[in-house]
Every structure is written in structure tokens, then in C-alpha cells.
Amino acid sequence: MARRPLVMGNWKLNGSKAFTKALIEDLKTELAGVEGCDVAIAPPVMYLAEAEAALKCSCSCGGKAIALGAQNVDVNVQGAFTGDISTEMLKDFGAKYIIIGHSERRTYHKESDEFIAKKFAALKQAGLVPVLCIGESEAENEAGKTEEVCARQIDAVLNTLGAEAFNGAVIAYEPIWAIGTGKSATPAQAQAVHAFIRGHIAKKDNAVAEQVIIQYGGSVNDANAAELFTQPDIDGALVGGASLKAPAFAVIVKAAAKAKN
């Protein structure tokens, strides 16, 4: 089946109120008239209000529809959980695509596969779209454990929620050794892992596997995106540094739209 690509910008710990408004205005200009690719951005949670307002203005002025996302969520809806953000709070700002399982969260905040699966469940229950990040470290890659690691991270969801939980969800394969390093998996390497991920889900439910969006992340930029998107199982990208520059991000979006339509 034809899958509509999704390119999402993960701004990480970057930006300001002024930066958020300016970048969205620039994206509106750069992406004018681009069809065939869904686009989302995940600014820091402090700037969701500015982003929501700027995106509403963009749509009302006939600009490209850009969805709002977030970089994290907690499993609790409310209560004594200092510093956490709930699904309902994110919905209140119009956020749709929520990143979970990013290697920076797994590493710096010691988030386990099991905890990430609980976040996945919370997002599905709230009607939001999980963007589940998976991927291996450089040591695991060199030891030939890429598929083993990816399978384990996916199984945390599969074995608790079932394959149907991936209906309407997004997976982002981000090899840790390629994130922010300037290194990137070759298109063939990335395709092999994406095909494995889809095949792993297909063992449980082929129909779900065929429709799930699998993005590539890990030093995706305006120079390598087009070649990555020629691969049949790469359905877009989760973009880090390049998403902070409207022209570079727009090149990636346009490359996805061209390759998949």
C-alpha cells in the first residue's frame, strides 16, 4: 500500500519565543505549494503556545498545514509529578505527534523499554500519535546486534499492547551513532533495518506492518535526504539540527514528497 511520508522536526533544547515565530513564518514561505508529504514540528514544550498560534495563522492564511508535536510525555494524567507533562496538556495546545523513546531520553533519563511502552499506551488512549524512536548504539552496531536491539524495543509495545497498537503510529529508526554526529547510515543500510522492522511487525499482523510509517533519523540533512527517500521502506524522516533552518528542512520535505508520489 502507498504510505504518505511524514517529515518531523525535533527542535530538541533550542529556540525562544521569537525564534519559534520566525522559523514557522519561514517554513510557511519555504513550504508553500508543497503537497504529498505530512509535516510536523516538535518545539520545546515551553513554546507550544507560540507555535500553536503561529501555525493557526499559517493555515488561516492558506499556508502549508504543519502539525504540532512534542518531544516527550509522562504516563500520568495529573497529580504530584513535578516537572512532567501529560497527554491532556499536550492536547490542550493542539499537539498531535509525540516523540517517545528518543535515545537521549533513554540515556540521560534512564527510560526503559517498559516505561516507554507505557507512554505509548498513554498516547494511544489519549488519541495522540506516538512517534516511537528505536535504534542501536555504535557498539551494538559493530557487534551485529542492530536487529536484536530494534526487535527488543518494538517488542516492549508488541508484547503488551499487540500489533494493532501500531495502527496510526509512527516508528523512527535512529541509530544512536548517527544522531548529531554528522554520520549517517547509507541508504542501503537504513533500508535493511527499516525492512527488518516492518517484517518484525508483520509476523504479528501484516496489514498493520504495511501501513505503519517508519521514519529514518540520524543526521538527516538537505544533502542526503533525497537518496534516503528512494528506499521503499523509508517513509520520511525525524530531523534534528536541519529542522532549525527553514531552507534545509524544506529541502527534506520536498525530497520526501517527490520520492513518494
From Swiss-Prot:
Q: Which UniProt keywords apply?
A: Cytoplasm, Gluconeogenesis, Glycolysis, Isomerase
Q: What is its main location?
A: cytoplasm
GO process terms (BP): gluconeogenesis; glyceraldehyde-3-phosphate biosynthetic process; glycerol catabolic process; glycolytic process
Q: How does it assemble?
A: Homodimer.
Lineage, highest ranks first: Bacteria, Pseudomonadati, Pseudomonadota, Gammaproteobacteria, Pasteurellales
InterPro entries from the xrefs? Aldolase_TIM, TIM_sf, TrioseP_Isoase_bac/euk, Triosephosphate_isomerase, Triosephosphate_isomerase_AS
Q: Does the keyword Nucleotide-binding apply?
A: no
Domain of life per record: Bacteria
Which locations, inside or outside the cell, does it occupy? Cytoplasm
Q: Which residues form the active site?
A: 102 (electrophile), 174 (proton acceptor)
Protein name in UniProt:
Triosephosphate isomerase
**Described function:** Involved in the gluconeogenesis. Catalyzes stereospecifically the conversion of dihydroxyacetone phosphate (DHAP) to D-glyceraldehyde-3-phosphate (G3P).
Q: Which residues bind substrate?
A: 10-12, 180, 219, 240-241
* Enzyme class, broadest EC rank: isomerase
Similarity comment: family membership: Belongs to the triosephosphate isomerase family.
PROSITE patterns noted in UniProt: TIM_1 (PS00171), TIM_2 (PS51440)
Asked whether the keyword Isomerase is assigned, the reply is yes
Q: Which organism is it from?
A: Pasteurella multocida (strain Pm70)
Pathway note: Carbohydrate biosynthesis; gluconeogenesis; Carbohydrate degradation; glycolysis; D-glyceraldehyde 3-phosphate from glycerone phosphate: step 1/1
Q: Name one GO molecular function term.
A: triose-phosphate isomerase activity
Which reaction is catalysed here?
A: D-glyceraldehyde 3-phosphate = dihydroxyacetone phosphate
GN (gene name): tpiA
E.C. no: 5.3.1.1
Give an example GO cellular component term for this record.
cytosol
